[in-house]
């Protein structure tokens, strides 16, 4: 350094300029902040003084960041040396001086705001304040290679990612699963073909948060899930069950009662009052005995039921004249009711007899009186070949003949003395208190029952007796049904023999004496028995006239009640003959045996088919009932 005269002006330091209020280069300037008091009041505490200073600094930094006055010296020589430049993919520098200065001011303001919030919880940061982007992160390794059978990723993510979202929400952290196996096979990676971040690392969970406390909390929950998946079996893992339940709820297949009740095969059947109701007839459940429609299957019939059915069957066969009357019927069935005194029955359609149950229970009418008119059944009295004749066996029906001739070609309606009497001459079944029929009996009830609604003592009955004519049978009268066919199996051996076998085994009885008619008054169905048996061999009077004479000769016989529905025939009117029948023979000459009766009246006028009442025999007197054969003509005179 030169001294003295050799000294230059540069060697002497420059004098400092005097400071003045108008100088613009002063380093210290007064700071004026709007809204902040410039005078500090006395008596403040240390916390209040610190809060005032911190708030003043926050406002100053906010003003600088807002106005862009970052305090960078304009002279480059006064600036501090810059670090190495950092460029982005576009070639722009990232760490410029302005960027570094702004980042420094933001960090300083962030620290001041954090301190101010701790001093004054009611402090509100500036509007342009944003927390810094720096975050705390941590990694949690997932032992997938050690336990390949456990799905750790599924336990962490959960159904639709809800488990991971819940952890992030609770811990205020961000969790990402990265590494090998974090991405499912087949998913497309980055478009540029580069690897995803952390893909070359082992499988792990990256936890990122603003604070270290949030990161630690999230890491602890992740480790608990991994530990539970390793130590607890899958069927006992509560987290796994909860995830499956939530997945079912999201899919709409959740049943809320699965865990509260047992399975159908494990729970007992609920008791119902209907299931406990048992029928006493059929043994079924669900209904009572009064509503049961079936009998108990397989129950054997009692002895009383069998005896009652046998008795009803024997009674029916006795009414048909095919079996003896059981001895107990008269005492158990109450007062006997004759068919003539029974109640009227409405007309039934053709070929439709009543059911056997009605015949067996009522026992009021024989079946040939209850059956309707039928053209398919022949009449015994209208053709030859009856029982015992040339027609066949004792129970075979002969073929109908076109003319009203006997079985041997004799006179019309002449009885064969060698064979059994015609059906209208056969005796009726004996009364219920007189035992069975005599052997060889084959016929139906006597003609007194065929009178139907005509009483014995009525005028119509006497009219027919006086004129030598048989009264017409009532409506609904039909001959007895034929016996069973030969192909029908016989009844079981335990029951009684069939009626036709009983009749074949019994020998013919001797004819009853004629004196029995005079000793006591016979019953109505016994009046024809004596007359028909005694007159069978004489041949002086025709059989149908013998019955009428015998009925007229017994005035003491009780009169039978007629059917109230039948209209009696007026005197002097003869029933019309059926179509196809031969005309009646002329009356016998005087002095013959047939002149004891009045000659028959002329036939009535023809019927009007258009009048239904006339056709039914209810409007014109003297017309026979519907579907009944007419009375036979009187016999020719005998020389």
UniProtKB/Swiss-Prot annotation:
A zinc finger (CCHC-type) spans 277-296. Detected in lung, ovary, adrenal gland, colon, kidney, muscle, pancreas, thyroid, placenta, brain, liver and heart. InterPro entries: BBP-like, KH_1_KHDC4/BBP-like, KH_dom, KH_dom_type_1_sf, SF1-HH, SF1-HH_sf, Znf_CCHC. Changing residue 21 to A: Decreases interaction with U2AF2 and spliceosome assembly. The modification Phosphoserine is found at residues 14, 20, 80, 82, 89. One of its GO terms (molecular function) is zinc ion binding. Necessary for the ATP-dependent first step of spliceosome assembly. Binds to the intron branch point sequence (BPS) 5'-UACUAAC-3' of the pre-mRNA. May act as transcription repressor. Residues 382-394 have a biased composition (Gly residues). It is found in: Nucleus. Residues 141-222 form the KH domain. A motif (Nuclear localization signal) lies at residues 15-19. This is Splicing factor 1. The modification Phosphotyrosine is found at residue 87. Keywords: Acetylation, Metal-binding, Methylation, mRNA processing, mRNA splicing, Nucleus, Phosphoprotein, Repressor, RNA-binding, Spliceosome, Transcription, Transcription regulation, Zinc, Zinc-finger. The modification N-acetylalanine is found at residue 2. Binds U2AF2. Interacts with U1 snRNA. Binds EWSR1, FUS and TAF15. Interacts with RBM17. The gene is SF1. One of its GO terms (biological process) is regulation of mRNA splicing, via spliceosome. Phosphorylation on Ser-20 interferes with U2AF2 binding and spliceosome assembly.
């Amino acid at each position: 350094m030169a001294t003295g005269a050799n000294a230059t002006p540069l060697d002497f330091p420059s004098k400092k300029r005097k400071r003045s209020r108008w100088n613009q280069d002063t380093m210290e300037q007064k700071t004026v902040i709007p809204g902040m008091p410039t005078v500090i009041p006395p008596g403040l505490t240390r916390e209040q003084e610190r809060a005032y200073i911190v708030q003043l600094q926050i406002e100053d930094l906010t003003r600088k960041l807002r106005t862009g006055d970052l305090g960078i010296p304009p002279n480059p020589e006064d600036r501090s040396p810059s670090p190495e430049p950092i460029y982005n993919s576009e070639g722009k520098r990232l760490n410029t001086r302005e960027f570094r200065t702004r980042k420094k001011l933001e960090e300083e303001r962030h620290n001041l705001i954090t301190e101010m919030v701790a001093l004054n919880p009611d402090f509100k940061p500036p509007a342009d304040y944003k927390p810094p982007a720096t975050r705390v992160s941590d990694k949690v390794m997932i032992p997938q290679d050690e336990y390949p059978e456990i799905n750790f990723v599924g336990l962490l993510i959960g159904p639709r990612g809800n488990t991971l979202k819940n952890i992030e929400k609770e811990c205020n952290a961000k969790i990402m699963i990265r590494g090998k196996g974090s991405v499912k096979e087949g998913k497309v990676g980055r478009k540029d073909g580069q690897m995803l971040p952390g893909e070359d690392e082992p499988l792990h969970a990256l936890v990122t948060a603003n604070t270290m406390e949030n990161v630690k909390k999230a890491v602890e929950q992740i480790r608990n899930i991994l530990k539970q998946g390793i130590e607890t079996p899958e069927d006992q893992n509560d987290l796994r069950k909860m995830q499956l339940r939530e997945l079912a709820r999201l899919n709409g297949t959740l049943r809320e009662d699965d865990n509260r009740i047992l399975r159908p095969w494990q729970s007992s059947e609920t008791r119902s009052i209907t299931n406990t109701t048992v029928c006493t007839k059929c043994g079924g459940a669900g209904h009572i005995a009064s509503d049961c429609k079936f009998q108990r299957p397989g129950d054997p019939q009692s002895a009383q039921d069998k005896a009652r059915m046998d008795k009803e069957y024997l009674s029916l066969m006795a009414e048909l004249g095919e079996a003896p009357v059981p001895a107990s019927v008269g005492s158990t069935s109450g007062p006997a009711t004759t068919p003539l005194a029974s109640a009227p029955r409405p007309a039934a359609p053709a070929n439709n007899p009543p059911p056997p149950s009605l015949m067996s229970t009522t026992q009021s009418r024989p079946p040939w009186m209850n059956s309707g008119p039928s053209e398919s059944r022949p009449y015994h009295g209208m053709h030859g070949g009856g029982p015992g004749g040339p027609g066949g066996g004792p129970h075979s029906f002969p073929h109908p003949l076109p003319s009203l001739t006997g079985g041997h070609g004799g006179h019309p309606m002449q009885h064969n003395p060698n064979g059994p009497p015609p059906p209208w001459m056969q005796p009726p079944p004996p009364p219920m208190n007189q035992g069975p029929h005599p052997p060889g009996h084959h016929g139906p009830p006597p003609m007194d029952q065929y009178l139907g609604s005509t009483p014995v003592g009525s005028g119509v009955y006497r009219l027919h007796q006086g004129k030598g004519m048989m009264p017409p049978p009532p409506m609904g009268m039909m001959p007895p049904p034929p016996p069973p066919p030969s192909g029908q199996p016989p009844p079981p051996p335990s029951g009684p023999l069939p009626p036709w076998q009983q009749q074949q085994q019994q020998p013919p009885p001797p004819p009853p004496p004629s004196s029995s008619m005079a000793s006591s008054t016979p019953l109505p169905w016994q009046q024809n028995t004596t007359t028909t048996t005694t007159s069978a061999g004489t041949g002086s009077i025709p059989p149908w006239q013998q019955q009428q004479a015998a009925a007229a000769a017994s005035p003491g016989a009780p009169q039978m009640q007629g059917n109230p529905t039948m209209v009696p025939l007026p005197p002097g009117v003869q029933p019309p003959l059926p179509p196809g029948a031969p005309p009646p023979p002329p009356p016998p000459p005087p002095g013959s045996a047939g002149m004891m009766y009045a000659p028959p009246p002329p036939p009535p006028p023809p019927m009007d088919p258009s009048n239904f009442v006339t056709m039914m025999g209810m409007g014109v007197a003297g017309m026979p009932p519907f579907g009944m054969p007419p009375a036979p003509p009187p016999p020719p005179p005998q020389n």
